[in-house]
């Protein structure tokens, strides 16, 4: 159903962004083939696609991933990705700079495969550490290198300094 819905939305001029996962290796070759066929079928029907390989989840959490919680972590990563995209144009009390839809659309329309990095940190140099984590995210099979457009969403407490924001933005832009 996703390719049909995406095609209708895309044909109507609606910005379409797909966030999809590739199955865990232990789910088998047949499941991977199905996922890759689904991704191939969806690719030309969306403006941007973020592909999250479930096997890379072990690189983004300190907790031990058990079979019982693996799918829950995958769901949480998907929720975070969709939430981050929504926050770009929506309201969040911790977001420093909100973009308007035209900004997001200009970058994501007809962009193809997209890279999304998320970083968070606390303490001294938190903005720098979060930006470094975002640009070197081990979650995706893509890299920020060669990006033709970048959207930066910086959220933080009220004590986040202008220098911190500038440092974080520079790290992303120079990556």
Annotate each PLM feature.
Residues 1-175:
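Tubulin/FtsZ superfamily GTPase core signature
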